């Protein structure tokens, strides 16, 4: 499992400080994966702001939902989905794709907005149907609509266990894809998180 304190997530920190990201630490060749032009720091910043605008539009239309967490994480999601993750919007179930687990799934508006801008789903549909009955854009993320979401969210503390399990599965399969987990600080009160951390350290899935 790769955590946000890793060298990959520091891409967004470099962007904030105006330093170029080291693409060699974030990109690796993957023959069957769709290639995407690397965005400049300025383009990443513009995309993050566009995602923030999408979040506000959808939340205002819905009349409810979390705003602070999604807005604050826009830079991180932009760095991951537009610079780090090896994914293909045309084939969201591709076996060799990287996985991202969103444990604190109540901040899912930023995930939806980012997936929409990355081409997994419609931006307009996200604006119009967030938290509506039958919409793929519910108050907590779920996997049932095939738009690039890896896990169902809701109970806090479960995401890191799921991510560690995915990372172990990749090792057993000798697969090259990587697992990333985003979680909130409040989740750390759950004992399940610490069991997952201990397992990750013992099995060295962080390396």
Residue ranges and their predicted role:
Residues 34-51:
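N-terminal hydrophobic or amphipathic helices/low-complexity stretches enriched
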Residues 48-64:
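N-terminal capping segment at the start of a domain
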Residues 55-58, 70-202:
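Cofactor-binding active-site loop characterized by glycine-rich and histidine/acidic residues
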């Amino acid at each position: 499992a790769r955590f946000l304190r890793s060298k990959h997530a520091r891409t967004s920190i470099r962007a904030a400080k105006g330093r170029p990201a080291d693409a060699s630490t974030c990109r690796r060749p993957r023959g069957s994966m769709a290639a995407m032009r690397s965005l400049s720091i300025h383009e990443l910043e513009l995309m993050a702001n566009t995602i923030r605008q999408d979040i506000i539009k959808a939340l205002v239309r819905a009349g409810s939902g979390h705003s602070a967490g999604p807005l604050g994480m826009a830079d991180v999601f932009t760095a991951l989905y537009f610079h780090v993750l090896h994914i293909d919007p045309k084939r969201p179930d591709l076996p060799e794709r990287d996985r991202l687990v969103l444990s604190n799934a109540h901040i899912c508006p930023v995930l939806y907005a980012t997936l929409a801008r990355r081409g997994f789903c419609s931006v307009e549909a996200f604006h119009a149907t967030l938290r509506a009955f039958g919409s793929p854009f519910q108050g907590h993320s779920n996997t049932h609509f095939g738009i690039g979401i890896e896990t169902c969210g809701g109970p806090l503390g479960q995401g890191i266990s799921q991510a560690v399990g995915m990372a172990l599965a990749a090792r057993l399969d000798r697969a090259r894809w990587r697992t990333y987990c985003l979680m909130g600080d409040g989740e750390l009160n759950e004992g399940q998180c610490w069991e997952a951390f201990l397992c990750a350290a013992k099995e060295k899935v962080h390396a």
